[in-house]
């Protein structure tokens, strides 16, 4: 992690990429790491900014302004995991690691979502691992924020994404001091986070809460496998919206429909906040897309590499009748 590991005093900083033996618990040590289907299949001149430490996700997006360059990622990426995410290391192949992200449910692996990431994006940090489940936590509510070595924010560090969750070490009226994997403690602006006490369950959101959160992403460019404020895909978008409000649903659209245990809903009974699903063909069971229902035949979605997060008519989106059903997440009234 850089700049200069968020320069400060205190503990020795663990080295990213060290000690990554199979079976080890590690944590993501960059803004967001992108999981690949296979290692070393990236385009160096395009995807390089997403593979360094620190990552440069804005620069990565800038290399993919045209549709075909962005669409190339389809089927080559698995998911993303933001700073502080817990992972299990399964395999090491040179400077790549096969991991599972424990917070992202999938029918593919009961432990979490699998994929390959650069070893430099991971750190074995025992101090962070001990604090994560027992400390108050700061969840980033801003789309992006910046970790700083000083409470004043005048010593910038690295960017952090929406829904990044880090252990709290202390706080003032203007800043929250957090533990950072693979780095010394750093500060986030208090206005950019919400703090929950250890063991505290966030209040159950209403449909309006979830929709309001989703509306903040309108205009964000689609990114296959994305779950961060630097780009989302359809199910990464819905997963992140509910996860931010303390509700766990599976990572992929098909699993959200078939394996998350959510209540089935008939089309005539749709309510705001329901998840609506679309199949690869009319009447099919293979799910290709999910969107958030807004009422009045409107959906909010991350559609494809050609577009950005948007609101549009459900009927207009589905002229060929690929609507496959809906599920309802339990929400507050």
Please identify what each model-predicted range represents.
Residues 1-55, 69-73, 79, 83-86, ...:
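Boundary regions of SH3-family modules and the immediately adjacent low-complexity/disordered segments
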Residues 70-76, 146-156, 258-266:
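Short alpha-helix capping/helix-loop boundary micro-motifs
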Residues 75, 81, 160, 269-270:
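Short, well-ordered loop/turn sites that connect or cap secondary structure elements
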Residues 84, 157, 161-166, 273:
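Loop/turn positions that initiate beta-strands
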Residues 153, 194, 227, 254, ...:
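Aromatic- and glycine-rich peptidoglycan recognition patches
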Residues 222-235, 240-272:
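Catalytic cysteine-centered active-site loop
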Residues 268, 280-285:
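Catalytic cores of extracellular degradative/oxidative enzymes
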């Amino acid at each position: 992690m850089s700049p200069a590991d968020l320069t400060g005093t205190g503990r020795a900083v663990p080295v990213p990429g060290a000690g990554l033996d199979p079976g080890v618990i590690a944590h993501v040590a960059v803004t967001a790491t992108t999981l690949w289907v296979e290692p070393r299949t990236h385009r160096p001149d395009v995807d390089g900014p997403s593979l360094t430490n620190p990552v440069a996700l804005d620069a990565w997006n800038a290399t993919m302004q045209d549709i075909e360059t962005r669409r190339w990622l389809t089927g080559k990426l698995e998911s993303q995991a933001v700073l502080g995410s817990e992972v299990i290391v399964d395999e090491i192949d040179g400077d790549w690691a096969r991991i599972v992200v424990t917070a992202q449910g999938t029918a593919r692996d009961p432990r979490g979502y699998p994929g390959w990431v650069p070893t430099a994006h991971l750190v074995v940090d025992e101090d962070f691992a001990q604090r994560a489940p027992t400390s108050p936590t700061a969840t980033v509510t801003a789309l992006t924020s910046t970790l700083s070595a000083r409470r004043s924010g005048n010593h910038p560090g690295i960017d952090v994404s929406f829904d990044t969750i880090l252990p709290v070490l202390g706080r003032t009226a203007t800043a929250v001091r957090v533990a950072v994997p693979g780095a010394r403690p750093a500060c986030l602006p208090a206005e950019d986070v919400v703090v929950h006490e250890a063991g505290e369950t966030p209040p159950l959101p209403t449909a309006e809460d979830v929709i309001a959160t989703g509306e903040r992403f309108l205009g964000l460019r689609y990114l296959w496998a994305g779950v961060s404020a630097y780009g989302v895909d359809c199910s990464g978008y819905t997963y992140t919206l509910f996860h931010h409000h303390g509700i766990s649903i599976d990572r992929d659209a098909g699993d959200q429909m078939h394996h998350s245990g959510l209540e089935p809903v008939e089309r005539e009974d749709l309510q705001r906040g329901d998840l609506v699903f679309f199949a690869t063909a009319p009447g099919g069971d293979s799910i290709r897309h999910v969107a958030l229902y807004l009422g009045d035949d409107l959906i909010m979605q991350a559609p494809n590499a050609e577009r950005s997060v948007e609101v549009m008519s459900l009927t207009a989106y589905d002229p060929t009748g690929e609507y496959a059903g809906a599920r309802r997440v339990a929400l507050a009234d």
